[in-house]
């Protein structure tokens, strides 16, 4: 309880410890060797100049901070300084890239804590959610996973928090405007998933609560209009720039239409892959399933149904986790990094399960 009262500070401390290899520059040569991988980034966080502008904006903003490169301890430790020719990668100082990944990880950790608090959980559960995220196989060594994917997930999580706060109120234009603006940003940070996931989660959540008419209220309609205006404005601005039409064509064909066409072709044939990946990458927390009180599972879900209006936060977490997993399975996702959007709500639900274990279950786990 004492640590939970200062949970964000403790999580920042643990993030700093996990980030030490990053700050020491251990990835600098690996960044160059890995090159640019699928979806515009390699495992190192290198952005592709053709795709997803938000990570570029983030890197550009960081590069404007005076002395930002000096945060990397690689500048002061013999043997890890970049060799000749590696000082610049993708137009950015090479030492900036690991720092950007580490900061993206910090945003994701703190927003997982914020998601737990926003959905009505106490400080203990929120603190435990951050610890679960930090200690799962999927996120162990979190700062060295692709920075662009973590930044996308952080934006998506913040958009979800704003939308949730807006949907549970009768009139909340500020929350919904912020939420849909962040949805537009997440669409430019992660492609199709950034656009589809928050809209589908909102739809399922409103249907679940029996408040679907809330989506057609004036603030909801105006906020959705803001989303369309922002995306159209960005597309128009890019189209009139050098190579803008080719960029838009690449984004639409490869990142928006291609996943839908591939999903139509597969028709769920490879949906088991993402579930199997999740079971492995969420270790050791996957083992929690062995110690849950399955005899009370009916009572548990009955409570969720009965209290769907009194405890909307729980419904939002379950809708987020189920919808995200279903979309990933439908799209035939087969890469671990694509699980990132699922991890924040799953971390909160896992933390709830850990804290509510019986004495026998706790000892067994």
Regions found by a protein language model. Give the residues of each.
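Membrane-integral, polyisoprenol-dependent glycosyltransferases
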Residues: 1-363
